[in-house]
Amino acid sequence: MKVLISPFAQTLRNGKENPKNFPYWGELVHKLLDRGIDVIQIGNIKDSCINFGSIMPHDHIGEFQFKQNLKFKEIANLLKECDTWISVDSFLQHLNQCLVRKRGIVIFSQSDPRIFGYSTNNNLLKDKAHLRDKQFWLWEQTEYNKDAFVTVDVVYKAVLKELKIE
């Protein structure tokens, strides 16, 4: 099994953490790799590899790859090759909807999946109470809130369900 991840939303101009960025990628990817699921992280040239903490990705059953600065066609091909994909509310879900239309998992925090998501995906939102009031304002005007995200276990269970693994 292979999962594509796009962990980061666009870098903010003010240098602050984008409120869309899920804070628990390292833990989630550890769980997937431990389960024998291969993970491919994609990002732009400015993105860094997710933080694995003290355990390196090669200490697992599954394999981890990090690919940067890919062309749209290359990303579309990866979407086709992977069994599912996971992203924050960012570019990947929109590219997928336009070019591939493969069901995936989108992690929302303060943006509303009823506005920015697609019903064909599994849109994960912890609580509507965390949605920002002005959905169309710039993200620089929104503070990062780690508590606005679903837990690692919620995402992990969603992945296993998509992969039909129990």
Set out the residue ranges of the language-model regions.
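Hydrophobic beta-strand residues in large extracellular and virion-surface proteins
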Residues: 3-5, 32, 39-42, 105-107, ...
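Conserved donor-binding/catalytic core segment of Leloir-type glycosyltransferases
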Residues: 1-15
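Gly/Pro- and small hydrophobic-enriched strand-loop and loop-to-helix capping segments
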Residues: 99-129
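Short, surface-exposed alpha-helical recognition segments that flank or form part
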Residues: 16, 70, 146-150
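Flexible, glycine-rich phosphate/dinucleotide-binding loops
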Residues: 12, 48, 113-114
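Short, flexible/disordered intra-domain loops and linkers
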Residues: 11-21, 51-52, 137-145
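Leloir-type glycosyltransferase catalytic cores
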Residues: 119-166
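Donor-binding and catalytic core of enzymes assembling or modifying cell-surface/extracellular glycoconjugates
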Residues: 20-110
